[in-house]
Structures are given as C-alpha cells and as structure tokens.
C-alpha cells in the first residue's frame, strides 16, 4: 500500500529557498535579482540566441507585408497612467514622423494599449496606425520584423524588441525619478554601466540612455540614416 504524500512544511520550503539564495553568490537584494538580466546571464545563458527568441509566424509576416509593404519604420508609443514620466514625448514623435516620411519611408504608429481604449492620444500623430498590433501578438511581431527599423521607449511592449533579432532603438532607458529606470538599477540588477548595451544585442539594436527629446531622437535618426 502506498503511503500518502504530503508537501513539506512551509518553513522547510522557505529554508531551502533561502539556502539556495545564499549559496548562489550571484544574487543581490534577496529575490529581486532573480528577475534581472545579470542573474540570467551568470546562471544560465552566455549565448545571444537564447534571448533572441521572439519571431513572427510566416502567415503573419505575409499579412503585414501585403498591407504595409516593407518600407516603413514603426513607432511604439507609451501613454500610460502608470509612471507617466516614462511616456513618449508626442511632440518629439510628431517631428520624427515627418522626418521619416521625408526619407521616403512610412511611419507606422503602434499605440499604447491603455491609451488605445481611453484618451487615444495617438490620433494626434496623423499617420497610419497599426490597430491590429493591439490585440494580436503575432501581427505585432510581424510589424517589427518587416520594418526597416523600430523606435520605442522603454517599458510596454519593448521586451518584444529586446528579445528578438529585429533592428530597434529604445529611448528613455534611464528616466529621472523612476528607480527601476535609474543608472544604479541597471548597474546593480542588469550588469550594465551607463551607455552600455545588453550582451546579447546586435549592431542594429540600440539602447538610448537619454530622454526622447526632439534633439536626441533626431540626432540618433540622422546618424542612423547617414550610416545606412
């Protein structure tokens, strides 16, 4: 006759977990380091392919290409009530859209999910909006993959860009007044010194350790176009 199997007491589970945390040596600030790029790099992955895992299905790529072609640049906006300091500077992106259009490329707006169902500030942009990107992750990823380049601010859907092979530039990697976007946080939890890139990023992928002001975004774009 088999004996009943009971889970270990909660105190034992907690003790084992704490023993592991103390044993690893790479962890800082208790459990929070589990969620950091620094922990993942040290304990599991040294090769880039492990993190560049997001890809769009073939049928989604075909749908997006038929609708938008491939001569476009996406702009993923953030317009959220949570930590509004991290939101996109719409004035900057107005100018960016005009500049992109002057280069013969189509700017495609990917709105913030919350904003899409509330204030809809993205309508101020007066450029094509990829409505399908709001509810279909495959189509959103296909938009990124088919694009000449992808522009965004940190947060929101930017992890899709970070964990893919598509070309991108993510602005506001640091934001004054937001602890999780501070240089200290990136150094302590992601192993990044100011201005550095994540170890698995490609040449065509950039983190901008500055605000998305008109001057900064335009300077980055002009440099990007000059080096194409």
Question: Which residue ranges define each predicted feature?
Answer:
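Active-site regions of enzymes building and remodeling cell-envelope glycoconjugates
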Residues: 1-10, 17-20, 119-132, 185-188
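A nucleotide-sugar donor-handling region in carbohydrate enzymes
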Residues: 6-74, 79
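Catalytic donor nucleotide-activated moiety binding site of glycosyltransferases and closely related
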Residues: 73-81, 90-137
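Short, solvent-exposed loop/turn segments at secondary-structure junctions
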Residues: 78-82, 114-116, 156-158, 174-177
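Hydrophobic/aromatic ligand-binding patch that stacks against planar heteroaromatic rings
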Residues: 99, 142-143, 160-163
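Acidic donor-binding loop of glycosyltransferase active sites
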Residues: 145-151
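Nucleotide-sugar donor-binding patch of glycosyltransferase catalytic domains
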Residues: 159-228
């Amino acid at each position: 006759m088999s004996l009943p199997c009971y889970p270990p007491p909660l105190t034992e589970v907690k003790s084992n977990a704490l023993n592991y945390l103390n044993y690893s040596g790479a962890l800082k600030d208790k459990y929070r380091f589990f969620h950091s790029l620094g922990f993942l790099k040290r304990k599991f992955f040294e090769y880039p392919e492990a993190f560049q895992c997001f890809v769009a299905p073939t049928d989604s790529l075909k749908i997006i290409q038929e609708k938008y072609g491939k001569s476009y640049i996406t702009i993923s906006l953030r317009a959220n009530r949570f930590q509004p300091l991290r939101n996109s500077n719409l004035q900057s992106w107005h100018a960016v859209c005009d500049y992109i259009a002057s280069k013969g490329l189509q700017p495609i707006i990917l709105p913030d999910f919350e904003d899409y169902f509330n204030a809809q500030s993205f309508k101020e942009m007066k450029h094509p909006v990829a409505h399908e990107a709001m509810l279909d992750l495959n189509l959103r990823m296909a938009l990124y993959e088919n694009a000449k380049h992808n522009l965004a601010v940190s947060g929101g859907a930017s992890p899709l860009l970070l964990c893919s092979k598509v070309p991108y530039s993510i602005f506001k990697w640091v934001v004054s007044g937001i602890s999780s976007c501070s240089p200290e946080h990136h150094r302590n939890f992601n192993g990044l010194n100011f201005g550095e890139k994540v170890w698995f990023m490609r040449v065509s992928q950039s983190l901008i350790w500055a605000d998305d002001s008109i001057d900064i975004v335009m300077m980055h774009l002009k440099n990007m176009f000059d080096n194409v």
